[in-house]
């Protein structure tokens, strides 16, 4: 088989198809017809017939990403060796705050209901907790002992 030079036609097709020369596909069985095409109109006619086509762009495969995601969904790859950043970086600050404030409010409510603190003290400590005065439950108890608020 003789290899025909269709570089001019390929270049014209690339211009018409708005792609690079490498992405132009020419039907190997119709090379003689393509060789005869001299004008852009001839090339357009061949494109319409399907003799000349535009190859699809090469993409980036997401198969590996999907596989990793599936494994993480199962709980794999989450051990200490895979973790980057401090513990605080992995749990958002808002979630940490929510956990702390819920524990403090639950504790305060229990103390008020059991009569260990009165309503006034409860309200004062509740407001302080909201303002971020206590780091934890133990810090709250320390404050109450220091200020003799427990009955």
UniProtKB/Swiss-Prot annotation:
Chain segments carrying region Disordered: 57-95
UniProt keyword Lipid metabolism present: no
Molecular function via GO: large ribosomal subunit rRNA binding; RNA binding; structural constituent of ribosome
Recorded GO CC terms: cytosolic large ribosomal subunit
Keyword Chloroplast annotated: no
Keyword vocabulary terms for this entry: Ribonucleoprotein, Ribosomal protein, RNA-binding, rRNA-binding
Bias kind Basic residues: ranges: 57-81
InterPro entries: 60S_ribosomal_eL19_sf (IPR035970), Ribosomal_eL19 (IPR039547), Ribosomal_eL19_arc (IPR033936), Ribosomal_eL19_CS (IPR023638), Ribosomal_eL19_dom (IPR000196), Ribosomal_eL19_dom1 (IPR015972)
Cross-referenced SUPFAM superfamilies: Ribosomal protein L19 (L19e)
GO BP term (any one): translation
Cross-referenced Pfam families: Ribosomal_L19e, Ribosomal_L19e_C
Similarity comment: family membership: Belongs to the eukaryotic ribosomal protein eL19 family.
PANTHER family in UniProt: 60S RIBOSOMAL PROTEIN L19 (PTHR10722)
Subunit structure: Part of the 50S ribosomal subunit.
Function, in words: Binds to the 23S rRNA.
Protein name: Large ribosomal subunit protein eL19
Lineage: Archaea, Methanobacteriati, Methanobacteriota, Methanomada group, Methanococci
């Amino acid at each position: 088989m003789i290899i025909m030079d269709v570089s001019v036609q390929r270049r014209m097709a690339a211009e018409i198809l708005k792609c690079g020369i490498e992405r132009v596909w020419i039907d190997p069985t119709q090379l003689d017809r393509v060789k005869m095409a001299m004008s852009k109109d001839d090339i357009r006619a061949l494109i319409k017939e399907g003799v000349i086509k535009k190859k699809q762009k090469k993409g980036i495969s997401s198969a590996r990403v999907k596989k990793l995601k599936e494994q993480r969904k199962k709980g794999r790859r989450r051990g200490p060796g895979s973790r980057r950043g401090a513990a605080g970086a992995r749990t958002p600050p808002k979630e940490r705050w929510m956990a702390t404030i819920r524990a403090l409010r639950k504790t305060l409510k229990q103390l008020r209901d059991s009569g260990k603190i009165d309503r006034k003290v409860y309200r004062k400590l509740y407001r302080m907790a909201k303002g971020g005065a206590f780091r934890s439950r133990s810090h709250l108890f320390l404050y109450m002992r220091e200020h003799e608020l427990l009955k």
